[in-house]
């Protein structure tokens, strides 16, 4: 693991490209407006009512796909499978492809784990009451660092994970980005279907996770891994799986 971090450090230092803009201002501006509009228009009706039973059942079926545990395990598996392939395969092309897979695993791991950690810290620091307690506290009740999950609604941790994961795939495979965005919205909104979060919690989580994926992609591009930087600073996925 020490060699892994040393390799990243060398790549970072060798890069002659300056750090591109992180676009956090634009992301924050759009997210704040979407969150405020959601709070004004949707959060109160959602908190005051219950989703119909079929909708809640659908949400319960789908919401588990946004759990970070299986995504983290999958990313670790990709990383070590790729590393093993790099050592065992013979041709230069096969080795390059195996290494590419391992870096995809590393990218997904960093994106999902660190965005999730930050989101969980934020939700504890903000301490917004969940929709289950709307009739007791309303939608603008906050108890920072209460240590109780009832006051850990904003932003949604599941939605952060979903936003990070599907944004990562949208950056890696931009041809399918519309499908990935649709999946992220659907899985994020399952948290509203099951009554665990307000829509504004989900919007904030999806946006934060997606921006964190962009940030991580920029850092990887700066190190020459998986991505390259376009003239405007946007990370573009490298392609190693072309046919011969």
UniProtKB/Swiss-Prot annotation:
Coiled coil: none
Keyword flag Nucleotidyltransferase: no
EC code(s) of this entry: 3.1.-.-
Organism superkingdom: Bacteria
Membrane-protein topology: Multi-pass membrane protein
Compartments reported by the entry: Cell inner membrane
Chain segments annotated as transmembrane: 28-48, 60-80, 98-118, 154-174, 178-198, 201-221
Alphabetically ordered keywords of this record: Cell inner membrane, Cell membrane, Hydrolase, Lipid A biosynthesis, Lipid biosynthesis, Lipid metabolism, Lipopolysaccharide biosynthesis, Membrane, Transmembrane, Transmembrane helix
Gene3D superfamilies: Phosphatidic acid phosphatase type 2/haloperoxidase
Example GO BP: lipopolysaccharide biosynthetic process
Pfam families in UniProt: PAP2
Annotated GO CC locations: plasma membrane
InterPro entries: P_Acid_Pase_2/haloperoxi_sf, P_Acid_Pase_2/haloperoxidase
GO molecular function: hydrolase activity
Pathway entry: Bacterial outer membrane biogenesis; LPS lipid A biosynthesis
Note: In this strain lipid A lacks phosphate groups, and both tetra- and pentaacylated species exist.
PANTHER family: DECAPRENYLPHOSPHORYL-5-PHOSPHORIBOSE PHOSPHATASE RV3807C-RELATED (PTHR14969:SF62), SPHINGOSINE-1-PHOSPHATE PHOSPHOHYDROLASE (PTHR14969)
Role description: Removes the 1-phosphate group from (tetraacyl) lipid A species, has no requirement for the Kdo(2) moiety of lipid A. Has no 4'-phosphatase activity. Reduces sensitivity of S.meliloti strain 1021 to the cationic antimicrobial peptide (CAMP) polymyxin B.
Family under the similarity heading: Belongs to the lipid A LpxE 1-phosphatase family.
UniProt-recorded name of the protein: Lipid A 1-phosphatase
Organism field: Rhizobium johnstonii (strain DSM 114642 / LMG 32736 / 3841)
């Amino acid at each position: 693991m020490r060699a892994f971090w040393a390799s990243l450090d060398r790549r970072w230092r060798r890069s002659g490209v300056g750090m591109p803009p992180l676009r956090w201002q634009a992301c924050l501006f759009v997210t704040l407006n979407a969150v405020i509009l959601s709070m004004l228009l949707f959060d109160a009706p959602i908190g005051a009512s219950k989703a119909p039973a079929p909708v809640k059942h659908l949400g319960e079926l789908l919401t588990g796909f946004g759990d970070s545990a299986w995504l983290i395990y999958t990313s670790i598996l990709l990383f070590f499978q790729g590393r093993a392939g790099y050592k065992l395969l013979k041709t230069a092309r096969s080795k390059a492809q195996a290494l590419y897979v391992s870096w995809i695993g590393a990218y997904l791991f960093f994106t999902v784990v660190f965005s999730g950690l930050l989101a969980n810290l934020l939700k504890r620091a903000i301490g917004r009451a969940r929709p289950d307690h709307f009739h007791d506290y309303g939608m603008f009740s906050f108890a920072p660092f209460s240590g109780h999950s009832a006051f850990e609604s904003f932003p949604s941790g599941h939605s952060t994970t979903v936003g990070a994961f599907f944004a990562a795939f949208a950056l890696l495979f931009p041809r399918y980005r519309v499908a990935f965005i649709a999946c992220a919205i659907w899985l994020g909104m399952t948290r509203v279907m099951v009554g665990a979060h307000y829509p504004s919690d989900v919007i904030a989580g999806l946006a934060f996770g997606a921006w964190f994926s962009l940030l991580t992609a920029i850092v990887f591009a700066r190190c020459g891994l998986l991505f390259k930087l376009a003239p405007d600073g946007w990370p573009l996925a490298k392609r190693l799986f072309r046919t011969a």
